[in-house]
A protein has these predicted regions:
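Active-site hotspot residues in diverse enzymes, especially metal/ion-binding acidic/histidine motifs
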Residues: 1-391
Length: 391
């Protein structure tokens, strides 16, 4: 057996570092990373033993910290959570989040730090207007004006196969980061918003359906405009807290302005001669939203009665449950290969790679620094550059 290369870390820093993560117990660390046993970690935290350099680096990676942090003599200031966990307000969730979600939030916040670092000497981005009251229509109108949004759309061809990407690009063009969270159950979260004066963050769960993501995106935009950074499930439950209810209404009004929506809905009902799931799907298609979002908007704008709303909700739910296997199969596709740059942009959005690539092009950073900032192998730079810089 070779000689162990010890990392003579500060045990106090190991304890502090774990306290900054969702790992409440030693065993929970071992569950995620079996090579770091609870027994060994306990000995390291007590100072009875030391990890090897390899083990310490693995632990630093797990905790999302620089390796050098473990050698500090004093604990750094605790990182302030920048959002309100609104999932807990209905009593269904504890305040804890999974390691997968926590890890994704760290990744997205780190990406924003990189964007800010490479743009700090440039002209400040356009300020998001502050509206100091709960006027749903005024805030929705401000969102539409800020984004230059024009709905209803002429047809589904406006957004092609993916309405979420259509709206996402509009939002990102206005320097609002839109990332997607991977590996997190949809029941745990649908959306996250973190307000900053420049480059605020929106994160959407990648496991959701594309049209459902559209509503989540605008729900989180409402939080950004209200400066009410939040972690949300966005289930439009009547028992949601007041802030969630307001943001649901703002999202609906921003995506589906009342007068335009009522006109489209009534025209469709007249053309088809009935209010059914086909009619609702066509209405939803003009705005790139889910049938459930369109149905709720029909009720909110009094196009249909409360009774008809619940009747149709039952029909749509039954149709979905009856066809869920087909829907999931169609969604997953036929094992068609997806290019690396497509996966990368799907997860991280366009702002990060565009900012880093421009920093390299202007001579601010080297090629190696560019690859490290993006977290990609050099061989992927060409395809990323083509996808981002010429879009």
């Amino acid at each position: 057996m070779g000689r162990k290369n010890y990392a003579f870390v500060n045990p106090q820093m190991l304890v502090w570092a774990r306290s900054e993560t969702p790992f409440e117990t030693l065993e929970s660390v071992e569950e995620i990373s079996p090579s770091i046993t609870a027994k060994n970690l306990e000995a390291w935290e007590k100072g009875d033993d030391y990890p090897s350099i390899t083990e310490a680096k693995k632990l630093a990676s797990l905790y999302k910290l620089p390796f050098a942090t473990f050698y500090l003599s004093e604990e750094p200031a605790r990182k302030v959570k920048r959002y309100t966990d609104r999932r807990t307000l209905k009593g269904f969730y504890s305040e804890n989040i999974s390691y997968a979600l926590w890890s994704e939030i760290q990744r997205i916040e780190s990406n924003r730090d990189s964007i800010v670092e490479f743009t700090e000497d440039e002209t400040p981005v356009r300020a998001i207007p502050s509206i100091p009251k709960d006027d749903v229509i005024e805030i929705a109108t401000a969102i539409r004006a800020y984004l230059g949004l024009d709905t209803p759309l002429r047809s589904k061809t406006a957004y092609g196969a993916n309405p979420f990407n259509y709206y996402r690009h509009i939002v990102e063009r206005n320097n609002i980061i839109v990332a997607q969270v991977s590996g997190v159950d949809i029941e745990e979260m649908k959306g996250l918003s973190i307000y900053f004066d420049s480059y605020p963050i929106i994160a959407i769960n990648n496991k959701d359906y594309d049209r459902s993501k559209v509503f989540s995106l605008f729900h989180e935009l409402a939080h950004i405009f209200r400066r009410s950074s939040s972690l949300c499930t966005i289930d439009m439950d009547e028992h949601s807290d007041q802030e969630e209810t307001i943001c649901d209404r703002i999202a609906a009004a921003a995506l589906m302005p009342e007068e335009a929506f009522k006109q489209i809905a009534n025209e469709c009902i007249t053309r088809i001669g009935a209010v059914n799931s086909i009619c609702i799907d066509r209405i939803a298609g003009r705005f790139g939203v889910s049938t459930i979002s369109a149905l709720r908007r029909m009720h909110e704008t009094k196009v249909i009665s409360r009774k008809l709303f619940f009747d149709l909700l039952g029909v749509i739910t039954d149709e979905y449950n009856a066809n869920i296997a087909y829907i999931e199969a169609a969604r997953k596709g036929k094992n068609v290969p997806v290019f690396y740059h497509v996966k990368y942009l799907n997860q991280n959005g366009f702002l990060l790679p565009r900012t880093v690539l421009m920093a390299h092009a202007s001579g601010k950073i080297t090629h190696g620094e560019m690859c490290r900032a993006l977290g990609v192998n050099s061989k992927h730079i060409g395809s990323l550059e083509q996808a981002v810089m010429f879009k």
